[in-house]
């Protein structure tokens, strides 16, 4: 039995430096084994392994493709880590953007908020937060990945009817700009790269949670 970290392909592409920082920290401080892309790494899990994820899509794949393996978000691993070099955000007011792909994962959502509190963030909540969120940036305006039918057909096919509706790039930008009008803070934090790209497409000053916490790592 071991604990295995899935670093998230899209997050690693977004920030190879910060992805490497957190992987090295998990090895050094927690003895967590590393793997690569969930599409191939899931088959390396053995009975009793615990899978740690940063990506909400990885989470869905783990839960459906290897349901006998326990899964936890990286935020649940780190939230009580007193050795972690938490940044001090100086009481900044930051809005939390929850992701549809994790709408039913309250432990993840709560851990994100507890970490923000540890970093001295004044959290601002959206009306459509927690289980009410239907947001995942512009990713829901594109064709579904063929991986969905293999690894998470219930969540992303059966239970996502009418959710993925491809639209032209210019319309994606307009929809993201409209979404961004609701924010009352200068900065928005999210924990999904799809959400991040969508928010930034709409002109929002958005930051990924991992980028925020690794500032002093």
What do these predicted ranges mean?
Residues 1-217:
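Iron-sulfur cluster-binding electron-transfer modules in prokaryotic oxidoreductases
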């Amino acid at each position: 039995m071991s604990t295995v970290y899935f670093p998230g392909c899209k997050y690693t592409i977004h920030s190879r430096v910060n992805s490497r920082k957190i992987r090295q920290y998990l090895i050094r401080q927690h003895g967590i084994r590393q793997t690569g892309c969930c599409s191939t790494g899931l088959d390396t899990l053995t009975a009793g392994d615990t899978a740690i994820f940063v990506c909400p899509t990885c989470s869905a794949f783990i839960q459906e493709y290897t349901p006998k393996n326990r899964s936890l978000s990286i935020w649940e691993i780190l939230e009580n880590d007193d050795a972690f070099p938490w940044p001090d955000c100086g009481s900044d007011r930051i809005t939390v953007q929850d992701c549809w792909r994790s709408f039913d994962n309250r432990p993840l959502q709560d851990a994100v908020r507890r970490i923000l509190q540890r970093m001295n963030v004044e959290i601002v909540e959206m009306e459509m937060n927690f289980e009410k969120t239907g947001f995942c940036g512009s990713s829901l305006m594109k064709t579904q990945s063929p991986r969905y039918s293999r690894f998470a057909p219930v969540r992303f096919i059966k239970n996502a009817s009418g959710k993925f509706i491809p639209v032209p790039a210019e319309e994606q930008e307009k929809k993201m700009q409209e979404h961004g009008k609701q924010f009352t803070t200068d900065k928005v934090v999210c924990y999904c790269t799809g959400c991040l790209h969508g928010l930034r497409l709409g002109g929002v000053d958005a930051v990924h949670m991992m980028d925020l916490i690794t500032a002093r790592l």
